[in-house]
Amino acid sequence: TEAPSGATESSDDTIDSIIDETNNEITGSEGGTVPSETNSDIENIINAELEKTKLDPTQGVTPKVGGVETQKSKIDPKKPLQYAVDREKEGLSKYKEGLLKFVATKEGYVLDKNLENKVHPIASLTKVMNILVTLDEVEKGNVSLEDNVCFNPQTTNIGGSWLNVKIGDCYKLKDLLRSEIIYSANNSAYLVAYHVGKGDIETFVKKMNQKAKDLGMTNTKFYTPAGLPTSMTGKNFDISTASDLYIMAKAAISNNNIREWASEPDLVFLNSNNIQIVYKSRNKLLNRYGIYGLKTGFHEQAGYNMIVASKQGNIEVISVILGANTEAQRISEQLKEFRALSSRMKLVYSKGKNMGQFNLKYAVKRKIDGVLSDKIYEIVGNNYEYKIKDLKIKTVVKKGTVIGKLETLKDGNLVSTVDILATEDVKELGSV
């Protein structure tokens, strides 16, 4: 198994010198934009890439992602709605140095990489760390996802993508985090930092850097809670590498809250007139090739960045691409990676395959057949071992009850589990 290559310990001084080089390298008018591709342009790119693939592009879209139900739109068709409009449009990138990428399975098997250790501005990918730090504080009991948090003068009118709010508007902390991962709302990111940092955003950013260090992200430095450019913050760019962002993404998809929120196609809030304000996900690849998240990011000096996480059967992949010139290129490059992956995937077991008999403790039948709930794949060149686990169910069994697990292992380490389901109803002993 190959892990991210070339990562080295870097002091803050070393990182600061890299930032200076990056700032000097990237020139051009900051803040100016031109119209971006239309949605139909992006759909054409997606459809063209999908046509090149022999496999069904929806393969791997499962009813559950990591134990969390795949999310559906929250729009109520019976209520009036308005779609949110960005304050500013994304434009052309001024970054012209070539793509940076790191694509690997969750367990670290590298599928593709290029300039993966080159430091680069990451724009709104920064918000993933914002969310990770906040969830750490939730786990410690310092804040709650149910906290009612209100916008104030310091956090309301942050530029770029934003929630259309006014001072005094209040939201649950959970919904602010959802707005970060789904819509990339900058004012939400600042309000979260203000709330978790107890009124001090700099304190929160220090927590972001400590979390990066704890994860082993040795070439990453955060200056803001949202990833906005220097022209808007007066601070250095938030920077990282493709290989470091893979590490961050792996931590993110280990959290079921993030998996759930990242898979939502839209964010819906009711305004004071009972009108639904709809903020559509910026991830246009949801539910293609098993993609269920994770985050996009753009400013002119960073280009178009994107991390996606995909689950196809037992195979989970993280793909990091930085520095695309346009949104269309960002989409196209991600689809090419998954098209290449599809050509390397070998079906080991079909969904519904009979995996043998499983024990029942207190049923009229002592054994029952179990079938796989999902497909099992291997990537050519990356063989797995498999282990069947009998749960020896002691309760009532209905058709579809989980009665076992198929574990996928690599070098003895657990990679993933797929449920094995009962094929019939079985009554308990003594029942009529």
PLM regions: where:
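Ser/Thr/Gly/Pro-rich low-complexity, disordered linker/stalk segments of secreted
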Residues: 1-74
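Intrinsically disordered, low-complexity segments enriched in small/polar residues
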Residues: 4, 26-30, 58, 64-65, ...
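Residues at secondary-structure transition points
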Residues: 12, 34-38, 233, 303, ...
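Generic alpha-helical secondary structure signal
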Residues: 13, 40, 171, 202-206, ...
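Short secondary-structure junctions and interdomain/linker hinges
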Residues: 53, 184-187, 344-348
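Active-site-adjacent loops and short helices of periplasmic peptidoglycan-processing enzymes
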Residues: 60-243, 253-256
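Domain-terminus/edge residues, biased toward the C-terminal soluble/receptor-binding domains
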Residues: 217, 234-432
